[in-house]
Amino acid sequence: MSMEIHVFFSGLPPLPLAVTKAMEQLGLDFAISDPDSGFELGGFMPMTNGSGMGAIETGTEVYLGSAKEMIDALGIEGIDPKLEHEISFRWGSDFMEGACAIALSVAIAKLTNGVIWEDSSGEVLSIENAVEICHEMTAAGKRQ
């Protein structure tokens, strides 16, 4: 079973370097492995947790699409219709991959004033709540 989290936003997706810096500013120890990559192509995005010899190689699946199409497909209500783009992050049972997905979603939401939608709970997550969940998943991933 896979899990998924979405960010609804307007404008262009932020550059990976800006996303990595935002994760750092939020206290999330993740980095996008290829700062020249983009979100437009989709697929697996390699990342690291930590740095140096103790860095953990990980990542998550990334898909970019239309906010309206995703909102309609999921039957979500209450999302501002001015938010035109959607980026989703998908992972399986690996907690560290889930932590990557949440770290990316928090950073992108912060950079774009976007809205984080968590599929399994069917609710909007605040930046603060998502950061807390990311820390919990990171700790669980290190024990996995």
What is each model feature region?
Residues M1-Q144:
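Acidic (Asp/Glu-rich) sequence patches and key acidic residues
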